[in-house]
Amino acid sequence: MFACVALAQKDKPWTEWSRKDVEKTLNDSAWGQTQMEGGAGAQSSNTSAVTQVAAQRSSDRELNSRQGESGEAKPVAYVKYHVRFLSAKPVRAAFARQVLLAKEQPDEALTTQLQGFIDRDFSEYIVISVGVEVGDQKMAGPIMAAFNGANSETLAKTVYLERKDGKKLFLMEYRAPVGDGMGAKFIFKRVLDGQPFLSENDNVRFVAQLNEKMKLDARYKLSNMLYDGKLEY
């Protein structure tokens, strides 16, 4: 399945990706996975970065109130954590395309600016971003508090990348969500002891324990992470 996604991306430039291409890359691909907790939230297709959850709260509360009055189903209590390799070019391309798709008219200047973001040099770092989607906005508060209250020091020993041989690479820097729509960011050194921490033959696990109740655990196979003939992670 991942190979089909990569092939579809290779066949057309990122500026021509569909919404389906974007969502697949960000949420169900070699570079982006979804960890779900709670009830079935499969019917939701709108992913909200953790920075966007609070902004939606007021309008969703009003909508939910109207739904309750009309006898329609109440929100399902689920959380989806979208864990992505932001340092991988296809993920940045998907975020860039998401921005363009939100525009009514093509914007050449914005496209050029976004291309610069896609081509940014990540040769020294591995960056994992985590976006959040909730089925019930009442759940947003504690989640926001966990991400916004964390810092590099508190997460230094509870966030790491782990290779298939058991070797761990602990967090270098944490950045809480800001208004860029990409969520929280976990930054790691790409090189350890003079060698890249990961190679094409590796499997890697991302683990982040933010508090007693919130733990992220996502696994990736690097041999699937080829984009335009290059290993992207």
Place the predicted regions along the sequence by residue:
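Sec/Tat signal peptide C-region and signal peptidase I cleavage site
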Residues: 2-8
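PEST-like low-complexity, intrinsically disordered acidic/proline/serine-rich tracts
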Residues: 9-233
